[in-house]
């Protein structure tokens, strides 16, 4: 059997047999809001008690508070839910959408292409079987979260997000957990407690977005903005040479398990429409796409044959399926294309290269630019956010921060203002390949020219010499730009520049980028960001190995690495690991120092350790050496009361 067929069979088995898979020693908890249908999921990690004294026969323990962490995994980790990927997820937001009374149910799909797919009986075996009713804004109505926010309306989505962003940190009473270094926020506004009103205000002013298509009620509300937790996007999608619907659904579930805040379906192969339907109906997180990819497939891959009619039909098709945000490369203008001529790597954006080719072939501005207002009108009817694409992002560090890149960025700022006229939510996409010392300029330029709309970057990669390790080269840049104010990071997997990522590549990319995002939250001083670090550090010092594993971003790998060298159960309680062994563990020695100091705390400091200063330093050293050997060459021993100085 070929490896491709084997991968597809394994993915289908995954879909058919998927069951709830909770995290180790974790419980799915729900925080209730002001109404019973606002239930915000979090993962609560239970911790072992700390040994604080007593004897071997009668030890004294102190309980450790459980730690709550942000949870993107949806019902896939809820033991009370019976998973059925063929039926889809619960429609969490459907009631909220209905009670606003500004949408209508359509009798049929509006897209010509979608109708053709539905009428094609040969697709019956591929098609998702439980298609939902399609909604659209009523005539004269706008249904975006930005519209509601500007009207002063605090939606259930906004209250949900406020509870989610606070991560239940008000429950903590242990000062060890709540201590935190002040951060450097570079002008970000990070309130101690996030309220629903704060969420509304940030959305109203364009500094944050809530991706929430009315046709994707399964998604759990989340926010992307500089003044909130840094988010991470995972890319999935088939290509013309590899992957299947089953594999992409498997990647979706896998990506959200490991922390994907949003997922982009970048499929360019067969059955894009059907693949996307399966993904949307089973996604607890917002889904983004690049509609241009599917539009290109509709004209047989010939960029010059693209036109507004094909693109418009594609936008409506995807909006009615439930896509939460579109990447639109509308800022790439004809006059910017010659600016890339002297680049080392030219135009590396897939969407950017398509638009550039179209502009040159027709020698006019792209239909995305000339029809941008119509794009906004479509988005406003379904609450699809716009992710304004950086088609001229640098593809090598040699091309970083050049004229073409920043010219397009300024145009994206102009388009942002147009989108806001229609109450359409906007984020701005960024690079790319940028060396470390040039990263901050990207954030500064974006804030200046794009009116503080959220920034969303691919990395950036800080060097070009590490194919196979670009999750690391980009993770460095991602942590930095997240610290400077970037709102969402698009993950990079080890397969970047090499091939389509598989399931394990998705996990590696996600863990790397959750690490980068968390490091940025710590550096910004996001309230409560340090709680998990503090809990893990305390567990590490107390040799609570299971707690260390369970608090880790990747408990499975942490446990596996430990067990490679200390597989016995006794290794889970040992006061050392295989790195240093029992005699050289700094934390074990440090604990002994702490116990020694505790035992002698009633003795004056100048008596606790007898170090007598002598007139002859060398003689003093010799005597202390003899004294050390005479007492058994032990690093620590009971204090000896020193004689009074003569």
Swiss-Prot record:
Location of the region described as Disordered in the Swiss-Prot/TrEMBL record: 624-646
Task: Look up the EC number in the record and give it.
Answer: 4.1.99.17
Keyword GTP-binding appears in the UniProt entry? no
Q: Name one GO cellular component term.
A: cytosol
Instruction: Provide the residue positions that the database annotates as binding [4Fe-4S] cluster.
Output: 577, 580, 585
Free-text comment on the cofactor: Binds 1 [4Fe-4S] cluster per subunit. The cluster is coordinated with 3 cysteines and an exchangeable S-adenosyl-L-methionine.
Task: State where substrate binds.
Answer: 235, 264, 293, 329, 349-351, 390-393, 429, 456
Q: Which cofactor does it need?
A: [4Fe-4S] cluster
Query: In which pathway is this protein known to take part?
Result: Cofactor biosynthesis; thiamine diphosphate biosynthesis
Cite the InterPro entries for this sequence.
ThiC (IPR037509), ThiC-associated_dom (IPR025747), ThiC/Bza_core_dom (IPR038521), ThiC/BzaA/B (IPR002817)
The reaction(s) this protein catalyses:
5-amino-1-(5-phospho-beta-D-ribosyl)imidazole + S-adenosyl-L-methionine = 4-amino-2-methyl-5-(phosphooxymethyl)pyrimidine + CO + 5'-deoxyadenosine + formate + L-methionine + 3 H(+)
One Pfam family recorded for the sequence: ThiC-associated
Instruction: Give the HAMAP family listed for this entry.
Output: ThiC (MF_00089)
Family the entry assigns? Belongs to the ThiC family.
Its quaternary organisation is: Homodimer.
Cited PANTHER family: PHOSPHOMETHYLPYRIMIDINE SYNTHASE, CHLOROPLASTIC, THIAMINE BIOSYNTHESIS PROTEIN THIC
Protein name (database record): Phosphomethylpyrimidine synthase
Organism per entry:
Vibrio parahaemolyticus serotype O3:K6 (strain RIMD 2210633)
């Amino acid at each position: 059997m070929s490896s491709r067929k084997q991968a597809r069979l394994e993915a289908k088995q995954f879909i058919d047999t998927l069951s709830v898979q909770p995290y180790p020693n974790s419980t799915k908890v729900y925080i209730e809001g002001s109404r019973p249908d606002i239930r915000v999921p979090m993962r609560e990690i239970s911790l072992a008690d700390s040994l604080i004294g007593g004897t071997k026969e009668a030890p004294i323990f102190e309980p450790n508070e459980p730690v709550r962490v942000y949870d993107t995994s949806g019902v896939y980790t809820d033991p009370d839910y019976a998973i059925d990927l063929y039926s889809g997820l619960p429609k969490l937001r459907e009631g909220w959408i209905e009670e606003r009374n500004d949408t209508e149910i359509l009798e049929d799909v509006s897209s010509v292409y979608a109708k053709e797919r539905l009428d094609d009986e040969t697709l019956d075996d591929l098609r998702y079987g439980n298609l939902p009713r399609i909604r659209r804004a009523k005539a004269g109505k706008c249904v975006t979260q930005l519209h509601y926010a500007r009207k002063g309306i605090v939606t259930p989505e906004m209250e949900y997000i406020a509870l989610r962003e606070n991560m239940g940190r008000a429950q903590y009473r242990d000062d060890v957990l709540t201590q935190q270094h002040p951060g450097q926020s570079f002008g970000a506004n990070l309130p101690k407690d996030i309220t629903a009103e704060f969420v509304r205000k940030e959305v109203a002013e364009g500094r944050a977005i809530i991706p929430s298509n009315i046709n994707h009620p399964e998604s759990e509300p989340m926010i992307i903005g500089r003044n909130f937790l840094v988010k991470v996007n995972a890319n999935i999608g088939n290509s013309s040479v590899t992957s299947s619907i089953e594999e992409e659904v498997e990647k979706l579930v896998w990506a959200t398990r490991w922390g994907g805040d949003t997922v982009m379906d970048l499929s360019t192969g067969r059955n894009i429409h059907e693949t996307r339907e399966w993904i949307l109906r089973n996604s607890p997180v917002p889904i983004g796409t690049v509609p241009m990819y599917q539009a290109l497939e509709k004209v047989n891959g010939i960029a010059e044959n693209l036109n507004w009619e094909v693109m418009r039909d594609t936008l409506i098709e995807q909006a009615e399926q439930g896509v939460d945000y579109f990447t639109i490369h509308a800022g790439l203008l004809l006059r910017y294309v010659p600016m890339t001529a002297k680049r080392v790597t030219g135009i590396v954006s897939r969407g950017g290269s398509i638009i550039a080719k179209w502009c040159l072939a027709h020698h006019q501005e792209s239909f995305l630019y000339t029809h941008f207002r119509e794009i906004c009108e479509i988005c406003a009817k379904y609450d699809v956010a716009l992710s304004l694409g950086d088609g001229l992002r640098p593809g090598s560090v040699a091309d970083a921060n050049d004229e073409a890149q920043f010219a397009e960025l300024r145009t994206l700022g102009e388009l942002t203002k147009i989108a806001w006229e229609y109450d359409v939510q906007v984020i701005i996409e960024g690079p790319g390949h940028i060396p470390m010392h040039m990263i901050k300029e990207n954030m500064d330029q974006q804030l200046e020219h794009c009116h503080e709309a959220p920034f969303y970057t691919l990395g950036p990669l800080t060097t070009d010499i590490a194919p196979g390790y670009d999750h690391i080269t980009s993770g460095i840049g991602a942590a930095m730009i997240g610290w400077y104010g970037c709102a969402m990071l698009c993950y990079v997997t080890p397969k970047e520049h090499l091939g389509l990522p598989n399931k394990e590549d998705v996990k590696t990319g996600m863990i790397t980028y959750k690490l980068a995002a968390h490091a940025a939250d710590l550096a910004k001083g996001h309230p409560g960001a340090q709680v998990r670090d503090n809990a893990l550090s305390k567990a590490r010092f107390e040799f609570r190995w299971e707690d260390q594993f369970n608090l880790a971003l990747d408990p499975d790998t942490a446990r596996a690495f430990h067990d490679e060298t200390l597989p016995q159960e006794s290794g889970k309680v040992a006061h050392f690991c295989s790195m240093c062994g029992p005699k050289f563990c700094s934390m074990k020695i440090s604990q002994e120092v702490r116990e020694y100091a505790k035992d002698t705390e009633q003795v004056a400091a100048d008596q606790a350790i007898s170090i007598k200063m002598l007139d002859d330093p060398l003689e003093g050293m010799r005597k202390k050496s003899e004294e050390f050997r005479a007492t058994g060459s032990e690093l620590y021993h009971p204090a000896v009361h020193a004689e009074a100085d003569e």
